[in-house]
């Protein structure tokens, strides 16, 4: 089933915040990660004859829930000493903005040289272009799972008691209510930051058009791990094409990539396919072989675009992901019970939040994020596993810390250009609420969320302008990508050619404005003028599920 990026337009009112610290802004933006049935990348191939089935949809009340105890990780090892913690737990908006818009001339990108099939020594790994060096060579296999839930408000996780599995991970791990104020709240730039450790301004991204050359310059975590040790099994399972494209980018892509297009005209059903495939991947993990899994869910974000983040539909989409997380964690715990000497570390994060009110629509979709309201810039990180304190809070964590953390867990020193730090190095800022239990954690995280605000006036206007301008080439790209998705080759190429011309006619001016508004790493003239790229790992459409016959109930 082909898909295209959903589009939306909206009006963002930043408002007036004390002495002109922010201004009212009116903007037009793109919706982010969800893809409609209009079409996806033209070369996405449906191969094979069978695929995982989505689970039967049940109400949260009817779904078997798991207690915190059932989801808890094995006994944690002693906490690592904080060696490079951030200086403060609460940075002013002005300081964050200054950091976000500063130049990055000292950053040295990596090159991601191919090492497929080559067993690397520690010295060889230290010499590779991604600047990651070996700190330890552990003989114990390492297993790490990162779960990405797009467009998710931490407040929505905390407020709904049906989100029992994510709340259990919070209760048995260390959690941050963090902010990315001063950085764009678009998915492609944000997930690139999460998966490379480099902020989008440095990487040169500001909209959702995938640019493969970005990851030749800034290697992904998959590139870094595969360069260090090709024996690490790297797996990516997602239902947004950009994630599959990022996983396949660079000279050393992830070992296994599965991309699920929209199924049954339902992102909840599609998220279920991602969840089941993730359970299968964990169950099939080979003992004695290190593994890194990245599981990505798009349904929450896409539902927020269609309705809003305060709607019952958004809450239901999040609860559906929560149920999938419960099944994934059950698989992790079962695997851990069978292999107690090889515990898993589980990290959960999001790329941005969403506004919980209706905004202007384009078609069926709304502008739900892309600007600088606290709803959009508030993010979260949950860290669960050995070395992370149970029931703790650490608001110095950020989603930019994910790649450095994974590097460190596998024995690598993160590249010198990384904007983040390993979460283990920030342990000095851990704290626990005075009162025990989840309610106290919930209140402490809610209080942290309430502290976050807008950037200063100049930054707010600059980022809004960047979002508006970046929407134009993205809109052109998406329209032509959707038009040509199911066309036959003779007609497809000339229409794509026209689309490429129009795209670059809007993209190059947008790149200039992006540079002027703080995107220091972009290329005004792209190295490849053809914007259409393949989507690796596209999965076949499962057989349609039968619609049950309604049964009359006597009352």
Predicted regions span which residues?
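Short, structured active-site-proximal loop/turn typified by the sulfatase FGly-forming signature C/S-X-P-X-R
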Residues: 155-190, 198
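Metal-dependent active-site segment of extracytoplasmic phospho-/sulfohydrolases and closely related
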Residues: 145-146, 165, 320-366, 406
């Amino acid at each position: 089933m082909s898909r295209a990026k959903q589009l939306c337009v909206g009006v963002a009112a930043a408002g007036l915040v004390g002495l002109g610290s922010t201004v009212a802004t009116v903007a037009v933006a793109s919706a982010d990660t969800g893809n409609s049935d209009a079409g996806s990348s033209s070369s996405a191939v449906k191969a094979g004859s069978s695929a995982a089935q989505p689970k039967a949809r049940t109400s949260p009340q009817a779904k078997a829930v798991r207690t915190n105890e059932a989801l808890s990780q094995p006994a944690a090892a002693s906490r690592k000493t904080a060696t490079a913690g951030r200086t403060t737990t609460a940075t002013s908006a002005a300081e964050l903005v200054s950091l976000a818009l500063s130049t990055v001339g000292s950053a040295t990108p990596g090159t991601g040289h191919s090492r497929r099939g080559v067993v690397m020594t520690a010295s060889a790994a230290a010499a590779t272009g991604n600047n990651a060096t070996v700190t330890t060579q552990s003989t114990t296999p390492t297993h790490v799972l990162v779960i990405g839930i797009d467009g998710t408000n931490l407040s929505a996780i905390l407020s709904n008691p049906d989100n029992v599995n994510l709340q259990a991970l919070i209760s048995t791990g260390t959690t941050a209510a963090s902010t990315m104020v001063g950085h764009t709240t678009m998915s492609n730039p944000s997930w690139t930051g999460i998966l490379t450790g480099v902020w989008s301004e440095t990487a040169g991204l500001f909209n959702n058009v995938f640019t493969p050359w970005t990851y030749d310059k800034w290697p992904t975590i998959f590139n870094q791990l595969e360069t260090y040790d090709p024996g690490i099994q790297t797996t990516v399972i997602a239902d947004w094409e950009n994630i599959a494209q990022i996983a396949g980018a660079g000279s050393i892509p992830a070992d296994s990539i599965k991309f699920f297009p929209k199924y049954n005209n339902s992102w909840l059903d599609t998220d279920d396919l991602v969840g089941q495939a993730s359970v299968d991947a964990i169950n099939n993990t080979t003992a004695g072989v290190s593994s890194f899994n990245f599981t990505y869910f798009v349904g929450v974000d896409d539902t927020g675009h269609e309705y809003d983040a305060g709607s019952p539909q958004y809450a239901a989409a999040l609860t559906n992901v929560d149920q999938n997380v419960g099944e994934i964690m059950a698989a992790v715990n079962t695997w851990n019970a069978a292999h107690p000497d090889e515990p898993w570390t589980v990290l959960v994060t999001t790329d941005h939040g969403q506004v919980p009110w209706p905004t202007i629509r384009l078609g069926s979709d709304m502008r739900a994020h892309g600007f600088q309201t606290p709803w959009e810039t508030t993010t979260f990180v949950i860290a669960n596993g050995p070395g992370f304190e149970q029931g703790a809070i650490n608001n110095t964590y950020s989603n930019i810390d994910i790649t450095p953390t994974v590097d460190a867990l596998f024995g690598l020193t993160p590249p010198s250009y990384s904007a983040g730090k390993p979460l283990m190095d920030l342990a000095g800022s851990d704290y626990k609420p005075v009162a025990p239990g989840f309610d106290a954690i919930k209140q402490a995280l809610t209080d942290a969320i309430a502290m976050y605000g807008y950037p200063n006036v100049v930054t707010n206007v600059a980022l809004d302008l960047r979002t508006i301008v970046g929407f134009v080439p993205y809109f052109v790209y998406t329209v032509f990508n959707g038009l040509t998705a199911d066309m036959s080759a003779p007609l497809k190429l000339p229409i794509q050619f026209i689309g490429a011309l129009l795209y670059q006619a809007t993209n190059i001016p947008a790149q200039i404005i992006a540079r002027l508004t703080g995107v220091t790493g972009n290329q005004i003239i792209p190295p490849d003028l053809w914007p259409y790229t393949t989507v690796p790992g596209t999965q076949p459409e499962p057989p349609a599920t039968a619609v049950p016959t309604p049964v009359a109930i006597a009352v």
